[in-house]
A protein has these predicted regions:
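C-terminal flanking helix
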Residues: 17, 21, 42, 115, ...
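A short pre-motif secondary-structure segment
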Residues: 121-125
């Protein structure tokens, strides 16, 4: 990477790292795992910077794949008790609609109930504000798969106990 490319890469990281971290935190519910996934994503981007035409799309795809792969690997390992945090982490969720301190744990708990694939689609589509086509491209699946998976995931979220009372049953009739 030459100096000009290096400056362009640094500018990209400066403008996008918070967005990537916010998506990763929503996908993982864990700040440290999210930081790690973003770091690995940016490492992969740096290695291919001169060949990547659409760095935002590349990062979305790599980040999502890393988070899904990590979740699958974690599901195969025995669970460990998390260590208590020794320092406060900055809040990457403070810049979006999850500002409500009371609502944030409920939303993260509900997202935890989804499969990694469902969660990635919901986070990219509704929290990342990407179109079905962009999510489809990021995950390498058909647009119809994104729509049907999002529909099933949202139906599951509507019935999640931590979100009880946030949805009006009359607005979402049973099928």
């Amino acid at each position: 990477m030459n100096k000009k490319q290096g400056r362009a890469f640094e500018a990209f990281v400066e403008s996008e790292d918070n967005n990537l971290l916010r998506l990763a935190v929503l996908m993982t519910s864990n700040y440290q795992l999210a930081e790690d996934a973003v770091q690995r994503t940016l490492e992969r981007l740096a290695a291919r910077w001169d060949r990547v035409e659409h760095p935002k799309a590349f990062c979305r795809k790599v980040l999502t794949n890393l988070v899904i792969d990590d979740a699958r690997a974690a599901a195969r390992r025995p669970r460990e008790e998390p260590l208590s945090p020794t320092h406060e982490n900055p809040d990457p969720l403070a810049q979006d609609g999850l500002r409500s301190v009371e609502l944030r744990p409920a939303v993260l708990s509900a997202l935890d109930s989804l499969t990694p694939h469902q969660r990635a689609i919901v986070v990219l589509r509704y929290f990342g504000d990407h179109s079905d086509a962009e999510v489809s491209q990021a995950l390498g699946v058909a647009v119809g798969t994104v729509k049907s998976t999002a529909s099933r995931a949202l139906a599951q979220l509507r019935t999640h106990p931590s979100l009880a009372g946030l949805f009006c049953p009359a607005d979402y009739p049973a099928r």
